Amino acid sequence: MAGRSGDRDEDLLKAVRLIKILYQSNPPPSPEGTRQARRNRRRRWRARQRQIHSIGERILSTYLGRSEEPVPLQLPPLERLNLNCSEDCGTSGTQGVGSPQISVESPTVLESGTEE
């Protein structure tokens, strides 16, 4: 199995070259003509781009043997997840993004469904 990774790299390069040729065969539309003509050309160009994208995905999955469905992500149990805003909460929307805060104790999130 010493040459297996080289074969896989070569397959990947073939797939990338083929996909590159597909994208090069569909240049962007020209900016000439009436507004309606330009709009129609852009619409047809975007449809061809979508087709090329789906063909490229099929080529990659064929050459690389990728599964169609993504690999499931292992998440911690929901009862251990906690939104903790006690430290450094900003209003920019980017602070605090990253690994989830996991509390030590497991608080009861949902009761059994009976009201008091």
UniProtKB/Swiss-Prot annotation:
Chain positions covered by the region annotation Disordered: 23-49, 86-116
Please state the gene responsible for encoding this protein: rev
Q: Where is this region: Homomultimerization?
A: 18-26
Domain remark in the UniProt entry: The RNA-binding motif binds to the RRE, a 240 bp stem-and-loop structure present in incompletely spliced viral pre-mRNAs. This region also contains the NLS which mediates nuclear localization via KPNB1 binding and, when the N-terminal sequence is present, nucleolar targeting. These overlapping functions prevent Rev bound to RRE from undesirable return to the nucleus. When Rev binds the RRE, the NLS becomes masked while the NES remains accessible. The leucine-rich NES mediates binding to human XPO1.
Query: What is annotated about its quaternary structure and interactions?
Result: Homomultimer; when bound to the RRE. Multimeric assembly is essential for activity and may involve XPO1. Binds to human KPNB1, XPO1, TNPO1, RANBP5 and IPO7. Interacts with the viral Integrase. Interacts with human KHDRBS1. Interacts with human NAP1; this interaction decreases Rev multimerization and stimulates its activity. Interacts with human DEAD-box helicases DDX3 and DDX24; these interactions may serve for viral RNA export to the cytoplasm and packaging, respectively.
What is known about what this protein does?
Answer: Escorts unspliced or incompletely spliced viral pre-mRNAs (late transcripts) out of the nucleus of infected cells. These pre-mRNAs carry a recognition sequence called Rev responsive element (RRE) located in the env gene, that is not present in fully spliced viral mRNAs (early transcripts). This function is essential since most viral proteins are translated from unspliced or partially spliced pre-mRNAs which cannot exit the nucleus by the pathway used by fully processed cellular mRNAs. Rev itself is translated from a fully spliced mRNA that readily exits the nucleus.
Q: Where is this motif: Nuclear export signal and binding to XPO1?
A: 73-84
Cite a single Pfam family from the UniProt record.
Answer: REV
Q: What else is known?
A: HIV-1 lineages are divided in three main groups, M (for Major), O (for Outlier), and N (for New, or Non-M, Non-O). The vast majority of strains found worldwide belong to the group M. Group O seems to be endemic to and largely confined to Cameroon and neighboring countries in West Central Africa, where these viruses represent a small minority of HIV-1 strains. The group N is represented by a limited number of isolates from Cameroonian persons. The group M is further subdivided in 9 clades or subtypes (A to D, F to H, J and K).
- The protein's name: Protein Rev
**One GO molecular function term?**
DNA-binding transcription factor activity
Disulfide bond positions: none
Motif Nuclear localization signal and RNA-binding (RRE) per record, residues: 34-50
- Name the domain of life this protein comes from: Viruses
Q: Which family does it belong to?
A: Belongs to the HIV-1 REV protein family.
Basic residues composition-biased segments: 36-49
One GO cellular component this record assigns the protein to is: host cell cytoplasm
Q: Where on the chain is Phosphoserine found, per UniProt? A: S5, S92, S99
Single biological process term from Gene Ontology: mRNA transport
**Provenance organism:** Human immunodeficiency virus type 1 group M subtype D (isolate Z6)
Keyword Cell membrane: yes or no?
Answer: no
Q: How is it modified after translation?
A: Asymmetrically arginine dimethylated at one site by host PRMT6. Methylation impairs the RNA-binding activity and export of viral RNA from the nucleus to the cytoplasm. Phosphorylated by protein kinase CK2. Presence of, and maybe binding to the N-terminus of the regulatory beta subunit of CK2 is necessary for CK2-mediated Rev's phosphorylation.
Sorted alphabetically, which keywords does the UniProt record give? AIDS, Host cytoplasm, Host nucleus, Host-virus interaction, Methylation, mRNA transport, Phosphoprotein, RNA-binding, Transport
Q: Which residues form a coiled coil?
A: none
Location of this chain's protein in the cell? Host nucleus, Host nucleolus; Host cytoplasm
